[in-house]
Regions:
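Active-site nucleotide/adenylate-binding loops and adjacent lid/helix of ATP-dependent enzymes
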Residues: 2-10, 14, 22, 77-81, ...
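Phosphate-binding site of ATP-dependent enzymes
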Residues: 195-283, 307-312
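Conserved metal-phosphate-binding beta-hairpin within the catalytic cores
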Residues: 221, 231-232, 289-322, 332
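Glycine-rich phosphate/pyrophosphate-binding beta-alpha loops
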Residues: 93, 191, 247-250, 317-331
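Active-site "cap" helix and flanking loop/linker of ATP-utilizing ligase/carboxylase catalytic domains
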Residues: 246-298, 330-353
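ATP-binding N-terminal substructure of ATP-dependent carboxylate-amine bond-forming enzymes
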Residues: 1-118, 122-128, 147-164, 168
Length: 353
């Protein structure tokens, strides 16, 4: 039987480059070598594309802050990808998860795993994804939006814009939201550039920090409660939701360091919630996925408020982590679909669509 040619792309130009390296090499190790002819492709931080020169079987899972070796630069990316049956873009953040590379695959007419251009770009932008979830009547945290370039612009609910000073943003936020608040770059993942704040001075500093990562900033009211995640998979003609998992962060919130470098951060699978609450979250996860016209794969994150037991949608990730500690493969493993079989399902779905 002829093997399916699979290109696994990882690395990339985003701030999540190192996580993508770990995810990508984890995927390569877990792909069935008898079914697939695997072509690892590494993109460095400058955006140059490389192929591996050693045997796929020798590729080890990279650790954070480790870069791959034994590489050869690809002269013509288009020609190289033309020979592939399917592409697995294990890229997190900008230039990989935001619709840009998906657009390239569409132009080349190549089949690929994951959400298409529109869903990828919308879900990468926290502000615009919130607008869609509002339209779908999915419960979310309260928030305000500002634009930050050489000046600050406040954007109201009707998308009217008003030039505003930093201290006036703080006043607006305090008028509309309660502490604690979270300040987030609109286009960022793995909690990069995200800050939890408890007072006006912290809020000012957090806005300045977020501005380094994006020119559009989201300020959200914090939810005191459980952080619960659900994996979604499009397979066999239907959208399925996994069991839920719970984040037990060693830090105040599930930051980049607590996700990838703090050994005390843990996940609880299944989440410590009732059967009814799990079913509610599973239905909401599928609804959110369909609302953005998702395809293939996503992980949807929620909060359950301690005081009210109410569920709030946090965000949707169209290319979740695939490291050994990542929630997405762990959730499906607990739901009866091991890592290797999960990859089979994702590839099968991509080849059909």
């Amino acid at each position: 039987m002829k093997k399916v040619k699979v290109a696994v792309i990882f690395g990339g130009k985003s701030t999540e480059h190192e996580v993508s390296n770990v995810s990508g090499t984890s995927v390569i190790q877990n792909l069935n070598k008898e079914k697939y002819e695997i072509f690892p492709i590494y993109i460095n931080k400058e955006g140059k594309w490389f192929e591996y020169t050693e045997e796929v079987e020798k590729i080890q899972i990279l650790e954070l802050n480790k870069e791959p070796e034994k590489l050869k630069e690809i002269n013509s990316i288009n020609e190289y990808l033309k020979n592939m049956d399917v592409i697995l873009p294990i890229l997190h953040g900008l230039y990989g998860e935001d619709g840009t590379i998906q657009g390239m695959f569409e132009v080349l007419g190549k089949k690929y795993v994951g959400c298409k251009v529109l869903a990828s770009s919308v879900c990468m932008d926290k502000v615009y994804s919130k607008m869609i979830f509002e339209k779908a009547q999915i419960n979310q945290t309260k928030y305000i939006t500002i634009k930050a370039n050489d000046k600050y612009i406040y954007v109201d609910e009707a998308l009217n814009e008003e030039e505003i000073k930093l201290e006036e943003i703080v006043a607006k936020a305090e008028e509309k939201l309660k502490y604690p608040m979270f300040v987030k770059p609109s286009n960022s993942g793995s909690s990069v550039g995200v800050t939890k704040v408890e007072c006006a001075k912290e809020l000012e500093n957090a806005i300045i920090t977020a501005k380094k990562y994006d020119k559009e900033i989201l300020i959200e009211e914090g939810i005191i409660g459980k952080e619960v995640e659900c994996a979604v998979l499009e397979a066999d003609g239907e959208v399925k939701a996994s069991c839920t998992g719970q984040i037990l962060s060693a830090e105040e919130f599930y930051s980049y360091s607590s996700k990838y470098t703090n050994a005390e951060s843990r996940t609880l699978i299944p989440a410590d919630i009732s059967k009814e609450k799990q079913e509610e979250i599973q239905k909401l996860a599928i609804k959110a996925f369909k609302a953005v016209n998702g395809s293939g794969i996503s992980r949807i994150d929620f909060f359950i408020e301690d005081k009210t037991n109410k569920v709030y949608l946090n965000e949707i990730n169209t290319m979740p982590g695939f490291t050994k500690i990542s929630m997405y493969p762990q959730l499906w493993n607990k739901s009866g679909l091991p890592y290797s079989k999960l990859l089979d399902k994702l590839i099968e779905n991509a080849l059909k669509n």
